[in-house]
């Protein structure tokens, strides 16, 4: 179920809290969904006649999810999607920020990436943005081409976050798999 494009209806119905459904959702999933809905609600409150920003919908399509519907909210079919029980997963989390100081982010690798990859960065309360990982270093500031294994700590320079709080950066890349390539060909 995805109601991001129906925030006006939810507000007018008196809904004052939302719940993320499902078991074993990742921290990345929760961060993206929470950020997206917070921004969509804020946009609606600032401009009740406007539409949700396209980037918000795009972000929800990047996280691992089953095919979206509005469920039974509008009382129309299909309330439940049966066409494919599998998950849509086009992006992988590649790193999570463990520490940030003086323009340097210390990151913990989650999935494989390489120097020169362009990654999306999720920052609390803001629209995600892209950075190219041109310069990555090990903990001793030796240049590296990629982090060699999961949970490996590495560093890169990043612009000062705009969120005004201790940043939580999550980096994601399009999935590099035969499944993703097949999906894009169709």
Residue ranges of model-derived segments:
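Surface-exposed amphipathic alpha-helical tracts and adjacent flexible/coil segments at the periphery
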Residues: 1-175, 180, 185
